[in-house]
Design a protein with these regions (language model features):
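Compact nucleic-acid interaction/catalytic patches
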Residues: 19-25, 30-60
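C-terminal terminal-subdomain/extension
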Residues: 59-108
Length: 108
């Protein structure tokens, strides 16, 4: 189990399906530390499809096995104990793209 996570860290996680039935082990991006939980979004190898998708330019630096897409449309709060392994961190360029899109689309 991980006690401290940081915005921009990439972990392998048991990510629940939207239906609530089952899960898949996949990389996730940490968006927010919520003490016992954290807010994450999924990372997929499926190419960019929507306005809340961002291509990871420096995917190898982030610890990803292949070119990947961050899906800010797929947010979920997970218990830190299901984070299996920190595999990397977003490069500054990718980190700034995520931060900009987050601030633009989720500003309340």
């Amino acid at each position: 189990m991980t006690s401290t996570v940081k915005f921009g860290d990439v972990y392998v996680c048991v990510f629940p399906f939207t239906s609530g039935q089952g899960a898949k082990v996949r990389p996730v991006l940490i968006l927010m530390d919520l003490e016992l939980d954290c807010l994450v979004c999924r990372i997929t190898s499926i190419p960019h499809r929507g306005f809340l998708d961002l291509t990871v330019s420096h995917w190898q630096e982030a610890g990803l096995e292949k070119p990947s897409t961050i899906r800010l449309s797929r947010l979920v709060t997970v218990e830190k104990q299901i984070l299996k392994l920190r595999i990397g961190r977003l490069a500054a360029e990718d980190f700034n793209h995520v931060r900009s899109l987050w601030n633009e689309k989720f500003r309340l």
